[in-house]
């Protein structure tokens, strides 16, 4: 079963994302960038679902760190953020960003279908 790491500081949203995805994927969650790094070190995910606005350590710093290691630089990343409209997809492609969802407009079926498509490439 493919593994997804959800990095979301809002625990309720993280639980909602897990409910949407858990029937098809093995899910782990991290509520901060620091916790995400520990999770990734323990169990390399096949895909990361990432919120950009995290407390403490910036998600952009996390993206830079992931790019600095061969084993993590190839992990596909899907962003789900309130800042989706402000993000430039083209400038984020070097970080292996595959899709950007606006949290307020994402539908469960759409999220699941996009993630399945990315993991089946």
Q: Model regions: which residues?
A:
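The feature encodes the CheY-like receiver
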Residues: 55, 85
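Acidic catalytic/metal-coordinating carboxylates
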Residues: 32, 58-64
């Amino acid at each position: 079963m493919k593994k997804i790491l959800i990095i979301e500081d809002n625990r309720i949203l993280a639980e909602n994302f897990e409910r949407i995805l858990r029937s098809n994927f093995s899910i782990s969650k991290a509520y901060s960038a620091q916790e995400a790094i520990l999770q990734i070190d323990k169990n390399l995910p096949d895909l990361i679902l990432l919120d950009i606005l995290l407390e403490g350590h910036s998600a952009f710093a996390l993206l830079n760190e992931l790019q600095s290691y061969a084993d993590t630089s190839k992990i596909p990343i899907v962003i789900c953020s309130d800042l989706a409209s402000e993000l430039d997809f083209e400038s984020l492609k070097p970080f292996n960003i595959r899709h950007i969802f606006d949290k307020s407009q994402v539908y469960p079926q759409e999220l699941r279908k996009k993630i399945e498509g990315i993991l089946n490439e």
